[in-house]
From Swiss-Prot:
Residues that span the membrane, as ranges: 37-57, 59-79, 107-127, 177-197, 199-219
Family to which this protein belongs: Belongs to the CobS family.
Species: Methanothermobacter thermautotrophicus (strain ATCC 29096 / DSM 1053 / JCM 10044 / NBRC 100330 / Delta H) (Methanobacterium thermoautotrophicum)
Superkingdom: Archaea
Keywords assigned by UniProt, alphabetized: Cell membrane, Cobalamin biosynthesis, Magnesium, Membrane, Transferase, Transmembrane, Transmembrane helix
Catalytic activity: alpha-ribazole + adenosylcob(III)inamide-GDP = adenosylcob(III)alamin + GMP + H(+); alpha-ribazole 5'-phosphate + adenosylcob(III)inamide-GDP = adenosylcob(III)alamin 5'-phosphate + GMP + H(+)
Cellular localisation: Cell membrane
Keyword Transport tagged: no
Protein name: Adenosylcobinamide-GDP ribazoletransferase
EC number: 2.7.8.26
Entry's Gene Ontology molecular function annotations: adenosylcobinamide-GDP ribazoletransferase activity; cobalamin 5'-phosphate synthase activity
Entry-linked NCBIfam families: cobS (TIGR00317)
Length: 249
């Protein structure tokens, strides 16, 4: 299958956009390092929604609208992974038992707790963005979410079975670091030093989540990758805010 068909598949897989594609999961996963590009597409949509909301609503509502639009536009897929990983982190037993809990459709206190922490912090971070960088911040946040996902995949151990292993294997490319640098430079051009810091924080966050998964579950699943997307968005926004504050921009 050509790259265009695979890219359509990746966009359809990552969003609620009803694009027709015959790409298999292996075809889609082959473009794992292109995921930040899809993140940019998502970021433009989220940023536009946030700016539009800011014209008629106060800041707190704008933050809720932007975050709500982001998780809806991505089909709530990654949010589900965040909840599942939270439940597994709170469990005890063997690695296999924790993986079983992660795949359990029921929601526990660990998942709800992690969801509350990440969602509330993300909303607060969006609310704290200066109006002049609202669009840029939301755009960089979505790109960084995908960068974080690739960072997590890069250090993860694939579990036989499931979709996550295809993305993990595809991330083991000699070009992964170049992709991270490219998006850090792009973020710098968009928002200066804070933008580059945001992407760097996302990379480190992804690696951290991957290492946490290795220690707690031995393997990583699609849920772990999904969780890294949500945490990556949050951490990149926090990094952006911290850099803005420290640099006085």
């Amino acid at each position: 299958m050509n790259v265009t068909g695979k890219l359509r598949g990746l966009i359809s897989f990552s969003t609620v956009l009803p694009l027709k594609s015959e790409a298999s999961i292996e075809d889609i996963a082959s473009l794992t390092l292109h995921w930040p590009l899809v993140g940019a597409l998502i970021g433009v949509a989220v940023g536009s929604a946030g700016v539009a909301a800011s014209l008629v609503f106060p800041g707190a509502v704008v933050a809720c609208v932007a975050y709500g639009f982001a998780i809806w536009f991505t089909g709530f897929h990654h949010l589900d992974g965040l909840i599942d990983m939270g439940d597994a982190l709170m469990s005890h037993g063997s690695f296999e038992r924790k993986i079983e809990i992660m795949r359990d459709p029921r929601i526990g206190t660990g998942g709800l707790g992690l969801l509350l922490i990440v969602s509330s912090t993300t909303i607060a971070a969006i609310y704290s963005l200066p109006q002049g960088v609202l669009f840029q911040g939301l755009l960089i946040g979505e790109v960084s979410a995908k960068v974080c996902l690739t960072g997590c995949a890069r250090v993860s151990r694939p579990l036989d079975g499931g979709t996550g292993r295809h993305f993990i294997m595809a991330s083991r490319s000699p070009f992964t670091g170049m992709v991270w640098i490219f998006w850090a430079v792009a973020a710098y051009l968009l928002a200066g030093v804070p933008g580059a810091v945001s992407v760097a924080v996302a990379v480190l966050s992804g690696v951290f989540i991957g290492l946490v998964a290795r220690r707690n579950f031995y393997w990583s699943t699609g849920d772990v990758l999904g969780a890294s997307n949500e945490v990556g968005r949050m951490m990149s926004l926090l990094g952006l805010l911290a850099a803005i504050r420290l640099t006085g921009l």
